[in-house]
Swiss-Prot record:
Transmembrane segment boundaries: 265-285
CDD domains per UniProt: CYP503A1-like
UniProt cofactor(s): heme
Biological source species: Aspergillus flavus (strain ATCC 200026 / FGSC A1120 / IAM 13836 / NRRL 3357 / JCM 12722 / SRRC 167)
Reported induction: Expression is induced by the developmental and secondary metabolism regulator veA.
InterPro entries reported for this sequence: Cyt_P450 (IPR001128), Cyt_P450_sf (IPR036396)
Pfam families in alphabetical order: p450
Keyword Transport: no
Keyword terms of this UniProt record: Heme, Iron, Membrane, Metal-binding, Monooxygenase, NADP, Oxidoreductase, Transmembrane, Transmembrane helix
Positions that bind heme: 410
Gene name in the database record: afvE
Cellular component aspect of the GO annotation: membrane
Phenotypic effect of disruption: Fails to produce aflavarin.
Protein's name according to its UniProt entry: Cytochrome P450 monooxygenase afvE
Taxonomic classification: Eukaryota, Fungi, Dikarya, Ascomycota, Pezizomycotina
Protein task: Cytochrome P450 monooxygenase; part of the gene cluster that mediates the biosynthesis of aflavarin, a bicoumarin that exhibits anti-insectan activity against the fungivorous beetle C.hemipterus.
Length: 471
């Protein structure tokens, strides 16, 4: 249906329609088409085709191109450069992740009193859960991206958050009009203009620091022998390795590469703050609605802290399988084709430019794969006999698709789940939290193929009593 005709069309229940399509098509091994937020269409592939598409190389199946089209990102930033993904792989090692963990812990420690309240305040404080957690995650993400001093740069964080918040609404605004009018909407709409202005302001703030880090990298040989100090350092080193930047001097294209690195930092911030915040928001909703989880999770992390010498390290998380299971259950509960492809398993040919998807949420709610799938079970993945979370929290499979699967699986899933667990459990250790409503509102809502947290839920928080924690 055209955008013009859709103005008069009635709304439909996304979750209900996707569930019906899953039963009618996916469960019988057939693909089906669905309309996306950008007025394009995607092909939802059944699970019996997984073995074929999960091994397709990046030049045939590109998540970055799909995201660029899906969210209209190609209109304002370069999303197709693979340097950010390669930089994440470069940072996916114990030494670097441990360093990032210290940044997360320190940033969370500094930000919590500013966002939620000081430890000395004993009274309950009313706050919006969605915006509180989103602000906290944005602060922590900035520390991992640029270093500890930038986690307190409120001006930069607020500007980049405003840009992030406007991405999907501006996409919906522009694509709600007929194609012939979209260039005018992009140029004249107050929403789109404000988003572009925030993007420009953010790049202006980032540019001097990126240039400074490049100069440091060029002046110090072996500067990353101990690993990158931040994701920006990892990006710069990856750009050196690829030849995008010269290690010795400016070849005359530094300004162009710096602008690209700034866009990649902005993309990193969006990916490490917004989806992570959504996971934590859902986890907080569960805790408020199921208080029986609070004490076991606190006790587990208290014991884990003792095993790691009293400091919150990366190893602390390794001793907290219940926490890992709880977060993985939160992830459960709550691609674009580059070249012509033929999937033999379902006899389907895909043209270049086709966006493909997997029926993730419906698979996660399928009783054939999960017992009592519509009931939240925080210990679903906890193996009590072994004291482990099985499978591991970041392990993907055809029936656990939160981070996609195969070659196109999210390369930052290890870092994302690390940030999620760290922020959530530190929040739970430091604060009591309860629902500020008489009864729990809906956790979230379906928005096309995505399931988003309810932004109107209010919580009440106060500092925990020290003797309750035992740490």
């Amino acid at each position: 249906m055209s955008a013009c005709l859709r103005w008069w069309s009635r709304k439909f229940d996304c979750e209900k329609e996707y569930a019906e399509a899953y039963k009618q098509y996916s469960k019988t091994g057939k693909p089906y088409a669905t309309r996306l937020k950008n007025n394009d269409h995607g092909i939802v592939l059944p699970l019996n085709s997984t073995k074929e598409w999960r091994t397709l190389p990046h030049d045939q199946l590109s998540f970055l191109h799909a995201l660029s089209e899906f969210a209209d990102l190609y209109m304002h930033i370069n999303m197709t450069d693979r340097t950010p993904l390669q930089a994440v792989h470069y940072c996916n090692n114990t030494k670097t992740l441990s360093r990032f963990n210290r940044l997360m812990v320190d940033a969370t420690d500094r930000a919590l009193p500013l966002i939620v309240g000081k430890d000395t305040e004993s009274e309950w404080k009313r706050a919006n859960a969605f915006h509180t957690i989103l602000s906290l995650c944005s602060t922590v993400a900035m520390s991992v991206l640029l270093g500890p001093e930038f986690s307190m740069d409120t001006s930069l964080i607020q500007t980049i958050m405003m840009y992030n918040t406007a991405i999907m609404p501006s996409c919906a605004k522009r694509t709600s009009y007929p194609r012939i009018l979209r260039p005018f909407v992009w140029r004249l709409s107050p929403l789109c203009r404000a988003m572009k202005s925030d993007l420009t302001k953010t790049k202006i703030k980032l540019t001097p620091e990126i240039k400074h880090r490049i100069d440091i990298a060029r002046s110090k040989k072996g500067w990353l022998e101990e690993g990158p100090m931040s994701l920006l350092d990892g990006l710069i080193e990856t750009a050196f390795e690829k030849g995008c930047l010269s290690r010795s001097s400016d070849r005359g294209d530094d300004d162009q590469q710096v602008a690209l690195l700034a866009e990649e930092i902005i993309f990193y911030h969006f990916e490490l703050s917004t989806p992570v915040a959504f996971f934590i928001i859902f986890a907080v909703y569960v805790i408020m609605n199921n208080k029986e989880y609070s004490t076991p999770l606190r006790e587990e992390i208290s014991e884990a802290l003792k095993l790691s010498g009293g400091s919150f390290t990366l190893d602390t998380l390794n001793h907290a399988p219940k926490l890992a299971s709880f977060v993985k259950e939160t992830c459960r509960f709550f691609r674009r084709v580059m070249k012509p492809i033929h999937l033999e398993s379902i006899n389907l040919s895909l043209k270049p430019g086709t966006i493909i998807m997997a029926p993730g949420r419906d698979v996660h709610l399928d009783p054939d794969y999960y017992d009592n799938p519509t009931t939240f079970n925080g210990y679903r993945f906890y193996d009590a006999s072994r004291g482990t979370c099985t499978p591991h929290i970041s392990t993907t499979s055809p029936t656990f698709l939160t981070f996609s699967h195969g070659i196109s699986a999210c390369p930052a899933r290890v870092l994302a789940t690390q940030i999620t667990r760290t922020i959530f459990i530190m929040f739970l250790l430091k604060f009591d939290v309860e629902l500020a409503h008489e009864e729990m509102p809906a956790y979230g809502f379906a928005n096309g193929p995505a399931y988003l947290p309810n932004p109107s839920v209010m919580m009440r928080v106060r500092p925990c009593q020290k003797d309750v924690l035992g740490v």
